[in-house]
Amino acid sequence: AMDNIAENKGQAYFAKTADEARRIVGELVGSKKSIVKAKSLTCEEIDLRQHLQELGNEVWETDLGELILQLLDESPMHILSPSIHVPKEDVAELFSKVMHKEVPTDIASEVAAARDFLRKRYVDADIGISGANIASADTGSLFVIENEGNARLSTGLPPVHIAVVGIEKLVPTLGESFKVA
């Protein structure tokens, strides 16, 4: 897989521990960078956002639930709906404060406010970070499946994309990737 990623003009690294993964990504990123990050359980497990922030980077979660939690400085409460415990009234108040504009207390307005807030961050980002649902060893291909559009923007707009992928996501062939994804 690593050779095939290199053949596609990418770089691949193997980390045995969370500390090693954070170190590798930290060395690739450096400091004083603007980063947009798509939801990734692997990145969450290794506390990547916090590590990159400690290195002096500005890191923005782009998943709506993760963004809410980042702004509240809270941890996820659920794997699929990380901010399910936060009432929409609290989200409207939070967004109004952070975004310096009145955000109505309805979900559609809150989503629109988050989209507007993140748009500039996508465009200005130096680096986009994501996970991947599946990685194909024979082609070096990554499958990133999403439902909000944030992963597409996080991986496609910044000039650099870093994917943090656990070994359990690696399958031997592209054909098998389609079956598993």
PLM features per residue range, with description:
Residues 1-181:
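The feature marks the mature, well-folded catalytic cores of soluble enzymes
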